[in-house]
Amino acid sequence: YYRRAKRLKILATEPLEIVNDALGYTIKYELDSFIHEYNTQLSLYTGFPLFREMQSNNMAETEKWDAARKVAYEGSILHFMRSVFHKKLNEAGFEIQFIVKNNNIETAIPLKDYYGSMRFYRDDSSNTVEIMPIQKEIAVIYKNETPSTLFLDSNRDASAAFQLSVVSFLPNETLDIEQNGFYFEQKDITINGYWAWEKIADMLPYDYKDRSTATETIEVNTTSVNAAPPV
């Protein structure tokens, strides 16, 4: 703990072992570092998770996990990044707005052209997509699912009609997105709102696919997370 800076830093010498019974995964998380800034209430943790599917005892348990994973996926940042890559934001239930600040007053501006406003560029040589939003902050609204009651209980000012997350980008820095939803450099964006609240409990591997609908193989990658408490 750094008293002058009011900063807590945690390092791990061994991978963290996480058992997620709700989603049916064991996660070996190699934590690089965890930092919490008490002045800003901003948390940053970076690391690399290795997911292993738990062995189900019966078909009912398998179906329960599949249903829970689908709920965790829909509206998640993984879902969002895949939707950006495939230019399917509207079809997936996402809406994007720019957040503009003037004299400490925030204004949300609806967008007509999501991809033009994010300066969407597809690099066919690497099968990646680059985005660099015109505004530093974007609001991501997921309209197909309402927020958890647990989230609403701790965020009284949040809307109960949709899930709202805020993503802050570094100026003049592109974010690269792969087909499986992996994006980099992950340290270059900060996440607030609903996605920050979900965190590891709802984290899915990059090769996740809905077994009832998916037909293609998705590449696996690692991740780091830059997250802040809900706004």
Region spans (language model):
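Surface-exposed, low-complexity/disordered segments
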Residues: 1-231
